[in-house]
Amino acid sequence: MDNMDRLNYLYEQKNTLEFKINIILTEMGLIKREDDKYEELILDCNKLSLELHNIEIEIIMRGGVLY
């Protein structure tokens, strides 16, 4: 697996995780924006997305090499 494959794998994992989170939220019936718990979960998802984005930036800054 080369570095580009690894980066693509990370993107796939991020997309899969976001998809699973959306399914869970839908199944729980948390579809109303005014629901405090829903807002809390959205914030958690946004934090996770930001962390994944920071990891991607770190990988790119290291020349695409995963350690």
What does each of the following model-derived ranges do?
Residues M1-F19:
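Short, charge/polar-rich alpha-helical segments
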Residues Q13-Y67:
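Short, charge-rich amphipathic interface segments used for partner binding and complex assembly
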